[in-house]
């Protein structure tokens, strides 16, 4: 079915979810680094997905992105720093965490993550990364990452599964 052929009365929540979110499923592969994109709610929604993958042995490195300063209950921190503190509390080893504290938006999250990956792990030694963000943010984030990352690095989506009807209704 072509999207251009869909009539308004044919739209269902399930069809909208399928159109927006198909082909962004996690493959379950092991990777060289897990990249978590920043947001004010990244610690609540995105970080647990990354930590689950880390504890499952899919990677021993996590890059936390987000330089935007936010007011959290414990004080004002960058998004990445707030995730860092939570990651330590959830059993991630300090030496397995990298912070990208400069970015202010999705494009910068990915650009500056590349810089940090080069500085810490060397891009030529990286073959696969796991990109963690919310489901509704994944298609755009994945397109940006696949455009900006070197061709030899496979970017695997790992969406935090919130479907559009859950975001609207719940």
Give names to the regions the model predicted:
Residues 1-170:
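A structural signal for short, hydrophobic/glycine-enriched beta-strand patches
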């Amino acid at each position: 079915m072509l999207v251009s052929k869909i009539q308004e009365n044919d739209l269902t929540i399930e069809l909208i979810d399928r159109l927006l979110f198909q082909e962004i499923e996690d493959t379950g592969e092991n990777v060289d680094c897990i990249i978590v994109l920043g947001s004010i709610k990244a610690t609540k929604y995105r970080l647990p997905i990354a930590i689950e993958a880390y504890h499952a042995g899919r990677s021993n490195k996590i890059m936390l992105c987000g330089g935007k300063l936010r007011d959290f209950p414990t004080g004002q921190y960058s998004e990445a720093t707030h995730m860092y503190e939570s990651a330590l509390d959830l059993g991630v080893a300090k030496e397995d965490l990298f912070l990208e504290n400069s970015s202010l938006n999705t494009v910068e999250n990915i650009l500056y993550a590349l810089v940090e990956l080069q500085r810490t792990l060397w891009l030529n030694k990286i073959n696969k990364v796991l990109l963690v963000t919310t489901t509704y943010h994944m298609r755009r984030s994945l397109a940006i990452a696949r455009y900006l990352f070197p061709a030899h690095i496979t970017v695997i989506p790992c969406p935090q599964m919130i479907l559009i009807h859950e975001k609207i209704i719940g």
